[in-house]
C-alpha cells in the first residue's frame, strides 16, 4: 500500500516540493543564507521607502528630520532601527553566503561564481551610494575613508577622487 502523500494528486506536489525535496543529502543550514539575503533586501527596501517619505534634503534641518521620524511618526523609531540593523544583517548574511561558496568549492563553477562576484560588486557600489550620498545627510567620515581607497589606485587614483568629489577631499553635502 502506497503512502497517501505519494499517491494523492495535490499532496504529491507538496511532497515533491517539501518532503522528498530533490536536494543533496549533505545540505546544511549554510544554504539558507541566499534566502536570508532576499528577506534582508526586502526589509531594506520597505523600511527605506517609508523613511524616505519623511526625509528632509536640507542640511540645516537634517537632524530635525531624524528626530521627527523617531518621535512623531508611528513606529518611526522601529523603522529607523530596522533599516540600520537590517543593513548590518544583510552584509553578515552576504559574507556568510560567500564564505559558504568558498568552503564548498562553488568557485569551480566559473560562470556562476563570476555572476556572484558581479553581484557582490554591485551590492558594494549600491551600499556606497546609500551610505555616502543621501541628499543633505552625507557621512563625511564614510565618504573620506571609502573614496580615499580609490586614491590608492596607481596612476589614476587621485584623478578618480577629484572627479568624484570635484576636488581633493569631501567638503559639503554633495547633492543639495
From Swiss-Prot:
- Could you share any additional remarks the record makes about this protein? Heme 1 (or BL or b562) is low-potential and absorbs at about 562 nm, and heme 2 (or BH or b566) is high-potential and absorbs at about 566 nm.
Molecular function GO terms recorded? metal ion binding; ubiquinol-cytochrome-c reductase activity
Provide one Gene Ontology biological process annotation. mitochondrial electron transport, ubiquinol to cytochrome c
Q: How is the co-factor bound, per the entry?
A: Binds 2 heme b groups non-covalently.
Tell me which cofactor or cofactors this protein depends on: heme b
One Pfam short name: Cytochrome_B
- One GO CC term on file: mitochondrial inner membrane
Keywords in UniProt for this one?
A: Electron transport, Heme, Iron, Membrane, Metal-binding, Mitochondrion, Mitochondrion inner membrane, Respiratory chain, Transmembrane, Transmembrane helix, Transport, Ubiquinone
Please describe what this protein does.
Component of the ubiquinol-cytochrome c reductase complex (complex III or cytochrome b-c1 complex) that is part of the mitochondrial respiratory chain. The b-c1 complex mediates electron transfer from ubiquinol to cytochrome c. Contributes to the generation of a proton gradient across the mitochondrial membrane that is then used for ATP synthesis.
Annotated positions binding heme b b566: 97
Protein name listed in UniProt: Cytochrome b
Oligomeric and partner information: The cytochrome bc1 complex contains 11 subunits: 3 respiratory subunits (MT-CYB, CYC1 and UQCRFS1), 2 core proteins (UQCRC1 and UQCRC2) and 6 low-molecular weight proteins (UQCRH/QCR6, UQCRB/QCR7, UQCRQ/QCR8, UQCR10/QCR9, UQCR11/QCR10 and a cleavage product of UQCRFS1). This cytochrome bc1 complex then forms a dimer.
InterPro entries named among the record's database cross-references:
Cyt_b/b6_N, Cytb/b6-like_sf, Cytochrome_b_N_euk/bac, Di-haem_cyt_TM
Indicate the principal place this protein occupies in or around the cell: mitochondrion
Q: Subcellular location, in the record's words?
A: Mitochondrion inner membrane
